Amino acid sequence: DVYKRQIATYVAGTMGSAHFWLGTAAGRTFIASPMCEVGSVGIMLTYQSFKNYFKKQGIDYREIYPDSADLKNYETRAIEDDNNEEPIKQRLAVMHRIFCDAISRNLGIAYDPELPLFRGQIFTGDVAVANGYIDQFGTLEDAVKWVLAQATVRKVNEMYNI
């Protein structure tokens, strides 16, 4: 319930990825300008292996696992041994869906895998407000006033058992 979340988010630059997740959990979102950017609901992983570099340098680099931990770092070993990215992509897909579901709940919109929002796109402030990804344009003062107004409403409701 929006009245339980008496927190406002104020965007004065870029609110992307995890910041978007956190920011949209507020009761109200304000954005300073059409030049601000929000979105980037996506997930990625960067992979680097230095094994060949170490080998060329004469360094014997080994990862040794006990037989009882055969699934430890399975995804990484699948890339290194077989150039197979699928295990990591499967894990990333699960985490991406968790991210999308959280954004869907925060914004009160249905998850649609075809929607650019859920595919990682960044939006300018005007597009974000028009699509309902941000509540309104405003200043930091507007955000503070909103929080104070919510606290006042809550207090009045408590006083009169509303």
Which role does the model predict for each range below?
Residues D1-C36, V41-I162:
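N-terminal organellar transit peptides
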